[in-house]
């Protein structure tokens, strides 16, 4: 039990320190890291079930989907999470024809897209919350920390 309490306190200290020193940028980096690692774990679980998702490109597109709220404002306005998810479906549909057997094509596509919707698409909403800057500059940070605390406890 002491080990669990220690790890919880340590994780909260890391979160608070990152948010305090790096503000929203640090939070976005943490969220992206958690998103990619969670998606990796999801794909490993699917592989253990006997299916073959497109894990590498799925992780790359998953990181882009998580960062989509930032990409919309800094890179191009069409790089929304929805358009990246549609692009992922097209890329996987093209790759599936040449790389998978006809017997397991649907499963590969379904599990890969399910992972993208289940993990990074949902995490991008937390990035959106972090980017809220009104009525106070730290509104998004406070809301994100509150959301993490409520879901943790």
What would you call each of these model-derived segments?
Residues 1-153:
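Membrane-embedded alpha-helical bundles of polytopic integral membrane proteins
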